[in-house]
Amino acid sequence: MTDINVVKERVIEELKKQGIDVYFIDFYVDDGGEPYFVYTFDELMIEEATEYYKNNWIVEGAFDDWSFWYADEPDDWLVADICDTIKHRIGRNNNA
């Protein structure tokens, strides 16, 4: 079974290899059962972003494409999909 924290760490490592720093704040599931993550690209904004999140304001990362992923499935495609989404949010395309 894949732990979502393992996915988070793999995403951070993969993006760092590509020169993109991202800082995760939290994962949550909304009332409709859709999973999201909240993150910021600016390390100095972690505290402020965390406060926004605590007040139920999404900071930079609402991502709901995990609805078809189950914890016992391999997570390679999920890591790749999250990385691709983050890169697109900062205007970088994966040309690999």
Description of each model-found segment:
Residues 22-88:
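Acidic, low-complexity, intrinsically disordered interaction modules
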Residues 1-31:
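Negatively charged, low-complexity tracts enriched in Asp/Glu with abundant Ser/Thr
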Residues 1-2, 13, 17, 61, ...:
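Short intrinsically disordered terminal tails
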